[in-house]
Amino acid sequence: MNSSIVINKILELNYKGFKEAYIRQIEDINYNQLSFDERLYDLLDSEYLYLKNKRVEMNFKLSRIKDKQAVIEEIDYLPQRKLNKSLILSLASMNFLKAKQNIIINGKTGTGKSFLAQAIGNRAINEGFTVYYIRTSTLLEEIKLSRIDGSYTNLVKRFARYKLLILDDFGISPISVDDATNLFEIIETRNQLSSTIITSQLPVKD
């Protein structure tokens, strides 16, 4: 059978990763030394990796993370920043997501709270988790608008489905009782189902 017929059939199925691997096998004579199962596995694995990378790419687009270049490996552990390196590396393992634990990152302006939160978010996306980043003030505004147009229930459901929600700049301005109640409902809906990271200038006791 002509290989072009096979390629056309692969294209009809939209197996783009499979197609690239198939062409690679045709052009590289070293593949002739592999068994049928080994070559088939290579084709399937290429398609799997292609789909996985597409999901990661899509999750990055939907995450709204501003600094997609933020990575945990570039965190500067200067003494004055008082960062717990072992704790941060532990967070990088994503075990907190698997355990559905929440994180509070607090510190003064310029200490890198947002960078750290986004670096963790970027790592989570690369590990296959869905992530959403939003400033707390923006979320509160979305909640108010959803109350007005009747879409509040759908908004709560939307924020509940992300495996990791990053709420940046919590408490940067005073929050009313209603705002606090609405925010608590969002967080409580996610409790024991997924994880939330909150960055704030406020001490944890506040």
Regions found by a protein language model. Give the residues of each.
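Walker A/P-loop
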Residues: I105-F129
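Conserved hydrophobic/aromatic pocket- or pore-lining residues that grip, position, or stack substrates
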Residues: I75, A117, R135
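Residue-level preference for the first positions of well-ordered beta-strands
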Residues: N102-I104, L164, S195
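Interdomain "pre-motor" coupling segment immediately N-terminal to P-loop NTPase/helicase cores
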Residues: L11, Y15-D67
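Phosphate-binding P-loop
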Residues: A92-K100
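N-terminal pre-P-loop "Q-motif" helix
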Residues: I75-S90
